[in-house]
UniProtKB/Swiss-Prot annotation:
It catalyses: tRNA(His) + L-histidine + ATP = L-histidyl-tRNA(His) + AMP + diphosphate + H(+). Belongs to the class-II aminoacyl-tRNA synthetase family. One of its GO terms (cellular component) is cytoplasm. The keyword Zinc does not apply. Pfam families: HGTP_anticodon (PF03129), tRNA-synt_His (PF13393). This is Histidine--tRNA ligase. It is found in: Cytoplasm.
Length: 466
């Protein structure tokens, strides 16, 4: 007999956990749609040459390739060594680039899409690292140009999503890569590749600490003078304390740089100022975001605004949502310039971390809201009719199909996390009522049959408010 077990690197949930996970998906989807984003799904596998056009190195080593047994056998016989034709997607960005390039002649721009699907990476199996996981992405794609105003709207989406998720106080850290690169120019770091390397080091400050990053930047690999490194580290330590303070700090940055301020720095500051102004108009409270000059995002394709979101009371979880602005999404697939801005929520890892931190305790019980007890075999038709009426009234209802002891049926409802248990014995039927036991409040009451669904609906709505 084979021992049942799941492969490493996957998150498999019990029903109550799956309900909580599904509700998080529903909240994210609902908020994406409220902001006018359209749903897109792409195949779980793509053509290898298309998927891997922009990748290499570590990414390619983590890709799962798809090969039929027949093709595999033929390749072995012929001695062919080329990559398999198909590969599983490792993120949602590359499939989006292919999708927009393929359908750009029929899409309406700016194209606003959301995508919530599983992706696959051959990560080394370890705690908190997954080989199969959900990503929940939004992107706004322009043709030739895209207004910086969309960057503010994306921040408003982040605020809406995490406010409704209700998993704790959060804060969006906001920056602009042009500000970082313009400041590096002012410190004599002018080579583009060196700038990107410095930004990658800055992005590791929280993990490695200031001393380690300082030593790296001064060391042989970078060779930046110590005085300039100190200026860089002082600069990236900048944090705003309020909306007004953020604007003051941006003004001070330009003033301190003087008339010789690099044009890229000026442009980045202007973009941040507009984003901050519009975020305020969009109703995002100032405690929900901060200017943070250390936020760089490790991915090199970000060119402007960048975001990182974290839970204030659970800093150990790290970033729960990140993204930014990029200049040309699909340059490997089309000659059209397709700038965009977007974010991604890695929901599988976030859910695992929240569960590990105890944040998910008690969030969800069951998607079944009521259970009808089967008193005896003679009352089956009546029990089914009660359940039918409840379902018509919008109540998720389960019926016990076997006339077990009533106490056993109650035990089942309690264990399954069902709130309402409905009973209709001979006496209740004669009086046209049903008995309802609220297992959450430990109360029992009678309701006229015709009012059953509406009464339970009111009780459930009140529970949402509480």
């Amino acid at each position: 007999m084979i021992k049942p077990r799941t492969p490493p690197g996957v998150l498999e949930l019990l029903p109550r956990e799956q309900i909580a996970f599904q509700r998080m998906l529903d909240v994210i989807r609902r908020n994406y749609e409220r902001f006018g984003f359209l749903p897109v799904e792409t195949p779980v596998f793509e053509l290898s040459d298309v998927l891997l056009t922009k990748s290499g190195g570590e990414t390619e080593r983590q890709v799962y390739f798809v090969q039929s047994t027949g093709t595999l056998a033929n390749a072995a016989e012929s001695g062919a060594t080329r990559l398999p034709e198909l590969a599983l997607r490792f993120d949602l960005t590359v499939p989006l680039a292919r999708y927009v390039a393929e359908y750009e002649h029929v899409l309406a721009f700016p194209f606003r899409r959301y995508q919530m699907q599983r992706v696959y990476r051959g990560e080394r199996a370890q705690r908190g690292r997954f080989r199969e996981f959900y990503q929940c992405d939004i992107d706004v794609i322009g043709k030739q140009t895209l207004s910086i105003r969309y960057d503010a709207e994306v921040l408003a989406v982040i605020h809406a999503v995490f406010s409704e998720l209700g998993i704790g106080d959060f804060q969006v850290q906001l920056n602009n890569r042009k500000v970082l690169r313009g400041f590096l120019e002012s410190q004599g770091v002018r080579d583009g590749d060196l700038q990107l390397a410095v930004l990658r080091e800055v992005d590791k400050l929280d993990k490695r600490g200031v001393l380690d990053v300082r030593d790296t930047l001064i060391g042989q690999g970078f060779g930046i003078p110590a005085a300039q490194v100190e200026n860089i580290l002082t600069f990236v330590a900048t944090r705003s304390t309020s909306h007004a303070d953020a604007l003051v700090r941006l003004d001070a940055l330009i003033e301190d740089s003087g008339p010789e301020a690099h044009e890229m720095l000026r442009q980045g500051v202007a973009e941040l100022r507009e984003v901050l102004t519009l975020v305020n108009v969009l109703g995002v409270p100032e405690h929900a975001y901060r200017l943070n000059f250390s936020i760089a995002r490790g991915l090199d394709y970000y060119t402007g605004t960048v975001y990182e979101t974290s839970l204030i009371n659970h800093p150990q979880i790290g970033s729960i949502c990140s993204g930014g602005r990029y200049e040309n999404l699909a340059n490997h697939y089309t000659q059209s310039k397709l700038p965009g801005v977007g974010i991604s929520i890695g929901l599988t890892r976030l859910f695992w971390q929240l569960r590990d931190a105890g944040v998910m305790d008690g969030i969800a019980e069951s998607s079944v809201q009521a259970m009808v007890v089967l008193m005896d075999e003679a009352t089956l038709d009546d029990a089914l009719d009660i359940a039918r009426c409840l379902r018509i009234g919008g109540i998720n209802t389960e019926v016990q199909m076997e006339a077990k002891k009533v106490s056993k049926q109650f035990q089942y409802a309690s264990r399954a996390g069902i709130r309402f248990v409905v009973l209709a014995g001979d006496d209740e039927r004669a009086r046209g009522v049903v008995a309802v036991k609220d297992l959450t409040r430990e109360q029992q009451f009678e309701i006229p049959r015709e009012e059953l669904a509406s009464t339970l609906q009111v009780e459930l709505e009140q529970a949402k408010v509480m």
